[in-house]
């Protein structure tokens, strides 16, 4: 729902039918930038590997060395119990906005997992293994990236750069092995031209090398916290999200337990 250049709400479909939900500030936490794209904000689209994760049970009774010798290299890792392994099977780079392709891959990946488990169970060392759980839906890693008022770059992130509008310190994709945490600027969450909308999650304005780090769940949570706080301040101070008082926002986040460096 638009009024001139400002987002005033969203239209949804539910069991109650079609409804409009209006707000003074809208936070797009869809992960795919669904709201800012529909509103006409500048953005780019990326392709990335999709996948379907699953868990294997009775792993502690299996002979993993025999299974790996037989060619099953990806047997996941123990999580949360020694008897349970979490396995991540990556698929091809895919348009995560193509619902027909996602539906096809959903079926393909589930069949592939069942087939793989059957093969494991008929291989020496894997007789006791069973499929404990599959993810509720196929995992999409990245789709749209917002064009914000500030772009995050890997060069800045790896240098330990602090932005004037830092709203969080994110973690790294490799678990910190050789890569430090990095500051996230508020400007990466705010559209260049669109008003009354803030983006949160993996769809912020970052360069290609930063995509893997920004899509981590913990980092997405941090940006969601900042987006909610900024939206509340914008409403309270009767200003546009791009005009939020940054020191006031940072002070609010710190009072709520956020670490900003």
Roles of regions detected by a PLM:
Residues 1-4, 9, 13-14, 18-25, ...:
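Flavin (FAD/FMN)-binding glycine-rich loop and adjacent Rossmann-like elements that form
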């Amino acid at each position: 729902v638009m009024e001139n250049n400002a987002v005033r709400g969203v239209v949804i479909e539910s069991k109650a039918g079609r409804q409009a939900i209006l707000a003074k500030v809208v936070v797009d936490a869809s992960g795919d930038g669904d709201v800012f794209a529909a509103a006409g904000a500048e953005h780019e689209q990326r392709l990335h590997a999709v996948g379907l994760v699953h868990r294997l049970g009775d792993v502690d009774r299996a002979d993993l060395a025999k299974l790996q010798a037989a060619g099953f290299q990806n047997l996941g890792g123990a999580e949360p119990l020694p008897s349970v392994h979490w396995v991540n099977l990556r698929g091809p780079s895919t348009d995560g906005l193509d619902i027909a392709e996602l539906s096809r891959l959903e079926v393909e990946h589930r069949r592939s997992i069942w087939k793989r488990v059957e093969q494991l169970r008929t291989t020496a060392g894997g007789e006791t293994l069973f499929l404990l759980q599959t993810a509720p839906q196929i995992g999409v890693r990245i789709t749209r990236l917002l064009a914000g008022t500030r772009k995050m770059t890997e060069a800045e992130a790896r240098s330990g750069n602090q932005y004037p509008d830092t709203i969080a310190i994110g973690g790294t994709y490799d678990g910190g092995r050789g890569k430090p945490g990095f500051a996230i600027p508020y400007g990466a969450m705010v559209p260049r031209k669109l008003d009354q909308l803030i983006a949160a999650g993996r769809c912020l304005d970052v360069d290609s090398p930063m995509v893997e780090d920004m899509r981590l769940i913990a980092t997405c949570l941090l940006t969601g916290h900042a987006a909610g706080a900024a939206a509340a301040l914008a409403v309270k101070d009767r200003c546009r999200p791009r005009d939020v008082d940054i020191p006031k926002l940072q002070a609010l986040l710190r009072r709520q337990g956020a670490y900003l460096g």
